[in-house]
Amino acid sequence: MTYQEALDWIHGQLKFGIKPGLERMAWMLKELGNPQNNLKAVHIVGTNGKGSTVNALQTIFTQAGYEVGTFTSPYIIDFKERISLNGQMISEEDLLDLVSRVKPVVERLPKETEHENATEFEIITVLMFLYFGQVHPVDIAFIEAGMGGLHDSTNLFKPLAVLCPSIGLDHQAILGNTHAEIAAEKVGVLKNGAPFIYATDRTDVRDVFEKKAREEGSKTYELGRDFTAEGSSHSFDFTYGDQKLDDIALAMAGQHQVANASLAIMASLLLQKDYPKVTPKLIKDALAHANWRGRTEFLRPNLMIDGAHNNESVKVLIDLLQSEHADKEIELLFAAIDTKPIDGMLAQLKSVGDLTVTSFDYPNSVKLDKYPEVYKQVPDFKTWIKEHVTTDNKNLYVITGSLYFISQVRKWVLEQASDV
């Protein structure tokens, strides 16, 4: 089997859709020797901010000299990004080796049990657990939940800590229709007295979190109550009890990144007793270099991409544009997948600049004829970039929406730059 054949096999499981539940995962992992039981790992859940928080933690612990695994989704350029070691994506050789071990087990699942076929995400999660727990053991892993928490495929290990940067309305068909219902699903990963670090401004979400923490014997750490972050992404001060980190500068702009980084700092301090090389000075140095591709990322001096893929993340993007780029004329290009609340997202975006919509090559991308007619349209992002993006720094060009869309934009723009 070649690497491409392995990749095609993984993606071929996409047809089995999304199936919440852990029975298939538990069976496959048992057949592989339960590698997840060997893991020392932190679980990151939430609606937005998971990837940035994972990236901050990865940068801190890698810079401290530990062997660090990360599991994130979706990928921005290359599928192998989803399983990374010390900030570098898994090699083709290692992924091929994992698939050769896992594929026979996956194929036995529907034949030897009453379970249906495994989904694509379940298989990728099994590959990750096998890699970090058995094939290439790590000192610590930072694992991002795929969707929700309680019934998510990742929820089969005992976490050192659980982090939740935000709760918003997304994937309601699966997770619930209210913030409280979604919060209950997310915090469902909390177990075994692991500390729970979170940020929220909603009483209903806080109540759900605190109730679950009491049930699990977990201590909670809430941003703004137990630890604070005062300032902006250019410079903020972090305080927890008598511990203070002053003048922290982030590589990523935006007030939401201050919150994400603060959760990562809090977790790092709590884990310090088992990972003593993580010092306050190292944390500050690491955060100054922790970039996350596809999130408020500048591909050119005046061209930003940002994967604002739901109402909450669109609001965060708008706050950033209004606070950091108020002196610019803003032009926006947007594309999404058809499970997102595009009317609300578009209504927000049109308030900050000249808005155009497009479609992209993805199975459930929103087609042009499905957008409200009031918005300008272009057939594809390449056309928009060629027609709109100039070297005039009076304007800021922002491409946003689905992370799948952003990944295609990023790849193409960087390829054009390399051809010059």
Task: Show the residue positions of the predicted features.
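A glycine-rich beta-strand to alpha-helix segment
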Residues: 384-414
